[in-house]
Amino acid sequence: MKKALLALFMVVSIAALAACGAGNDNQSKDNAKDGDLWASIKKKGVLTVGTEGTYEPFTYHDKDTDKLTGYDVEVITEVAKRLGLKVDFKETQWDSMFAGLNSKRFDVVANQVGKTDREDKYDFSDKYTTSRAVVVTKKDNNDIKSEADVKGKTSAQSLTSNYNKLATNAGAKVEGVEGMAQALQMIQQGRVDMTYNDKLAVLNYLKTSGNKNVKIAFETGEPQSTYFTFRKGSGEVVDQVNKALKEMKEDGTLSKISKKWFGEDVSK
């Protein structure tokens, strides 16, 4: 009986070790693939970029030409150009963006991504935008004037965004949406009280849309920077993108693009 048990134990142990070895082999293969990512990108001559295409003025379609444009689109296109690459944009809803990156549908995300709570999972470029969060309400809403008024109110947010965390931390009840456009629509319909979003995006919306039905109730939080975002292990690709960004900062190109879209340099 003891011999039978010992034999069974040895079989199980060997199987477990084999499984661990296979897991390590698979992990090594995955790391090798990511390590070869830059070589693969160079060979294809194409940088594949995930972006929303619905987040004006960062990534959206021009109303007249339907061409994908925006600050993020222009910056990453210039980065690729300096690296001798073309850009292939893959438009994706925000809440599916990181799943697309993880599944290697694209090499990088260009969509105003913050680092908070993501640094353990992803690699990031140097920053290329700095802004603050604002809270938007209906024009005639006089109940929300500061962070202290948010608790118990309903805020429309993309569930995987940092703005969702700001709303939740302030005590708001969150209604999930696909982006800022839907959030603003729900505010005007009276279905939610507010939304947290980027100051630059909201100012641009108010300027270009002429919408008088919503307003910025207040600014909140510390200045937030945004970064191009990569899978972990994309080291050489990140280095190359940072090299191009550094050149763009030094020769004034990044500042020029920033002033074109916002009237000031928001890249610092």
Swiss-Prot record:
What's the superkingdom here? Bacteria
Q: What does this protein do?
A: Part of the ABC transporter complex TcyABC involved in L-cystine import.
Could you state one GO cellular component term attached to this entry?
A: plasma membrane
Q: Which Pfam families match?
A: SBP_bac_3
Q: Which organism is it from?
A: Bacillus subtilis (strain 168)
Xref: SMART domains: PBPb (SM00062)
Query: Per UniProt, what is the membrane topology?
Result: Lipid-anchor
Q: Which residue positions does the secretion signal occupy?
A: 1-19
Protein keywords: Amino-acid transport, Cell membrane, Lipoprotein, Membrane, Palmitate, Signal, Transport
Q: Which SUPFAM superfamilies match?
A: Periplasmic binding protein-like II
**Name under which the protein is recorded:** L-cystine-binding protein TcyA
As for family, the record states: Belongs to the bacterial solute-binding protein 3 family.
Segments passing through the bilayer = none
The record's annotation in PROSITE patterns points to: PROKAR_LIPOPROTEIN, SBP_BACTERIAL_3
- Residues annotated as coiled-coil are none
Q: Which GO terms describe its biological process?
A: amino acid transport
Query: Where is a lipid covalently linked (S-diacylglycerol cysteine)?
Result: C20
Keyword Coiled coil on entry: no
Lipid-modified residues of type N-palmitoyl cysteine are C20
Q: Where in the cell is it found?
A: Cell membrane
Q: Which InterPro entries match?
A: SBP_3_CS, Solute-binding_3/MltF_N
Question: Which cysteines does the record link by disulfide bonds?
Answer: none
Subunit composition?
A: The complex is composed of two ATP-binding proteins (TcyC), two transmembrane proteins (TcyB) and a solute-binding protein (TcyA).
